[in-house]
Structure formats: structure tokens, C-alpha cells
Amino acid sequence: MVPFDKKNLFLTGEDEAEGYCQTGYGVCPDGTGFVANRTYMPGVTVDMMDWWFPWHSVGSDLRYKIWDPKDHYFARADRAAYVLDPRVPMKEKTWGVDHYIMEDTGAGPEFLQLCFKRPSDFGYDESLVGKGKCASLVCAIGKSRIAAAMTHKWYPYKEGILFCSRFWIGFGWVDGRIVKTLPEGAEIPAKAARGLYHHSIEEFTNLAAILPDVYRENRDNF
């Protein structure tokens, strides 16, 4: 998979042209792990996905549970008033917001804090967002037993969108930067990467099936 320091290639789609993994998981020579996945979502639009990420973090816990009923328990934004503020553009409603989550990615229910970032704070070139193979995105640092950096991007594709995910496992937020936090000599267990990979496939396949109806019925019920 594309290395974290070359992550802008993911936004442009050049990582595929350069032969980096698009779907799979593994452990890198430095011990960090990776997960790559992409999901075709027919009937889903860019605007629907922009709406989904803030919408499911406020209001009823059911919003997160319907995403993946077997493995999702709750997701709660720490700045609900900001998320609900109609003056905040939809694409910015995750910026600087932490989601406190309970979910099961293969090792049993686990608490997770997802710290969402503005793309530039994550280290992305924001001029690449909103065009080509990155119509929109969300990016976050996950704090749990194992720290990870995460990006989901999406763009129009066929009769819907193509939703693409990347997880760099063993990277965390230190002094305002994202760096490798995995201790030297340590290695991410392959089963951890595999569990996250299978969970990603399941949750986004589920989301592709429900989002058009959920959006149609709730778009004005933020």
C-alpha cells in the first residue's frame, strides 16, 4: 500500500498507477500494518456521503448501529453543537471533532476515539480535494490499543460512487504531526490488520445498501 509519506498519491489515484495495493491488508517491513479497501456504491452520491459522516455521530445511537448491526454499538461526537450548526459546511462538520465509538473489528467490542482532522492538518495537499479521484474525504487518527491513521475518499463512479479506504496502523498524533508511534522492533499482528480489513468490507458493503434510503428519509432530520 502507498506509504504514509506518499499519501497524496492516494488522493490523485496515482498510487494505483504506481502499483500500490488497492484492496488487501498486511504488515510492512518496519512492523506497521496497512489496510486498503474500495467499495462501489450504486445509487450513492458524493453529497450523501458528506452528510453521512457527521449525521451518524449525533442524535440516536441507532444511527451508528444501522451501519453495521452486528459490530457497531455507538458513535458520539464530542462537539455536537458544532456538528449541528447549520453555518458549518457539510464537508467541514468532522474537522476537529472526536467521535467516541464502541465497535468490534474482530477482537471483541472495543472503545475507540477517532480524532477527525482537516485534510491539511493530516498532511494532505487540499488543492487535490474536490477534483478527479477525490471528490471528498474524511481523515482521522484512531486512538485505541493500536494507534492508526485513516482516510476515506470518494468520487463519482458509474451509477454511484467509488469509496476508497486506507489505514496506516501504528501511526499516531504527536506534537501536532502524524508519525510512526509503533515502538522499534515491534510488529502489528497480522490478525489485527486482517480483522480491520474484513470489518471494513462488511460495514461499507452494508452502508452502500442502506444509505440512499436513509438519506432520502432523514436528510432534513439532522
Task: Name each model feature, range by range.
Residues W55-G59, D71, H99, K158, ...:
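Short, isolated positions within intrinsically disordered regulatory regions of eukaryotic proteins
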Residues A148:
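Anaerobic metallocofactor- and corrinoid-dependent redox/one-carbon enzyme cores
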Residues W51-W55, W67, W95, W154, ...:
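A residue-identity detector for tryptophan
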Residues V44, K131-G132, Y155-G160:
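Short, solvent-exposed coil/turn segments at beta-strand boundaries
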Residues D71-S144:
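Glycine-rich portal/gate segments that line the openings of hydrophobic small-molecule binding cavities
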Residues V2-V88:
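Hydrophobic ligand-binding cavity/cleft-lining segments
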Residues W55, I101, F111, N206-A209, ...:
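A generic structural signal for well-ordered alpha-helical segments enriched in polar/charged residues
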Residues M1-D30, I141-K143, K153-F222:
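Terminal "cap-and-tail" regions of soluble proteins that handle hydrophobic small molecules
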